[in-house]
Swiss-Prot record:
Changing V233D: In strain: CLIB 219, CLIB 388, CLIB 410, CLIB 413, CLIB 556, CLIB 630, YIIc12 haplotype Ha2 and YIIc17 haplotype Ha2. The gene is DFP4. Changing S96N: In strain: CLIB 95, CLIB 219, CLIB 382, CLIB 388, CLIB 410, CLIB 413, CLIB 556, CLIB 630, K1, R12, R13, YIIc12 and YIIc17. This is DUP240 protein DFP4. Belongs to the DUP/COS family. Changing N9D: In strain: CLIB 95, CLIB 219, CLIB 382, CLIB 388, CLIB 410, CLIB 413, CLIB 556, CLIB 630, K1, R12, R13, YIIc12 and YIIc17. Disruption phenotype: Cells lacking all 10 proteins of the DUP240 multigene family show no obvious alterations in mating, sporulation and cell growth. It comes from Saccharomyces cerevisiae (strain ATCC 204508 / S288c). Changing I75V: In strain: CLIB 95, CLIB 382, CLIB 556 haplotype Ha1, K1, R12, R13, YIIc12 haplotype Ha1 and YIIc17 haplotype Ha1. It comes from the Eukaryota. GO terms for cellular component: plasma membrane.
C-alpha cells in the first residue's frame, strides 16, 4: 500500500490535517485516503483478491455441476466452495473491527499503546488521539506487523482499540478496589484470554493498564469540566 505517515515537509491534503503542536503536523491515512472504504480495500487487498478468485472458481464449478457433465465429485466441491465463500464474506466485517486490530498487536505494541496514553493524556476529543495513532503506526511498522505506516486509519480507530484493550473490561465496574484485586490475581500467575484479544497479560501490562486508565479518566474529567463548567464535575 502506498499511503505513508509523515511529519510533514510534504504537501498533504490540507483539509485532513490535525495540528498537534506548534510547527508540527501529523499526517494519517485518513488524510491521504479520505474514504474509509478505499482504506479498507487497500489494507485487505490480498484477502479480498483471494475471495474474488475463490468466488470465480465457485461459480465455474457450480455451472459444471448444473451442466450435463456434472458428476458427484464436482457437485460436492461446488457445495463446499459455496460454504467457504459465505464464510469468507462473513469474515470481511471482522477485519475492520477493533477486536481484529487488537489481535494483530503483540505485547510490545500493547505496552506502547498504554505508554502513549500515559504520555499524551488523550480525552474524549478524538483529535487528541491522532498523535497516538501516528506514533503507533510507526511503531507497528517498525515491528513488521504492518507493511506500511497505516495500521490505524485515524485517532478514532486507535481509541477504539484502546477501549478494547483496557477500557471495556475495567470501566464496566468503576470500583477501583476491583481493579487492584484483578491486578493481584494476575500477579499470582493467572492468565486470561478474553474476547478483546488480551492473551497472557502479565502483571507489568496490568500495571500499565491501571496507570493508563487513571490518566485517561483524569483527562476525560478535565475535558468535561472545561466544556461544561456548570456541571461541577470533580475527579
Amino acid at each position: 500500500m502506498s499511503s505513508e505517515l509523515l511529519i510533514s515537509n510534504s504537501k498533504p491534503r490540507p483539509e485532513g490535517l490535525r495540528k498537534l503542536c506548534e510547527g508540527e503536523t501529523v499526517i494519517l491515512p485518513r488524510d491521504i485516503t479520505p474514504s474509509k472504504c478505499a482504506y479498507f480495500l487497500k489494507q485487505n487487498i490480498v484477502f479480498i483478491s483471494y475471495i474474488f478468485i475463490h468466488i470465480i472458481i465457485t461459480i465455474i464449478l457450480n455451472r459444471l455441476a448444473l451442466s450435463a457433465h456434472g458428476n458427484t465429485l464436482i457437485i460436492i466441491l461446488a457445495a463446499l466452495l459455496i460454504t467457504i465463500s459465505l464464510f469468507l464474506l462473513l469474515l470481511l466485517p471482522y477485519l475492520s473491527c477493533s477486536r481484529y486490530k487488537l489481535r494483530c498487536l503483540d505485547d510490545d505494541c500493547k505496552f506502547k499503546l498504554l505508554a502513549e496514553v500515559i504520555t499524551h493524556k488523550p480525552n474524549m476529543d478524538l483529535s487528541t488521539w491522532d498523535r497516538i495513532a501516528y506514533d503507533m503506526n510507526q511503531f507497528v511498522y517498525d515491528r513488521r506487523i504492518c507493511a506500511d505506516r497505516s495500521f490505524f486509519y485515524d485517532g478514532s480507530y486507535c481509541y477504539q482499540v484502546f477501549k478494547k484493550l483496557v477500557a471495556t473490561p475495567y470501566l464496566v465496574n468503576s470500583n477501583m478496589n476491583s481493579i487492584y484485586a484483578d491486578l493481584e490475581m494476575r500477579s499470582n500467575g493467572a492468565t486470561n484470554i478474553n474476547d478483546s484479544g488480551n492473551s497472557s497479560l502479565h502483571i507489568e501490562l496490568g500495571t500499565y493498564i491501571f496507570k493508563a486508565l487513571a490518566v485517561f479518566r483524569n483527562s476525560v474529567d478535565k475535558y468535561w469540566e472545561d466544556k461544561y463548567p456548570e456541571m461541577g464535575v470533580t475527579v
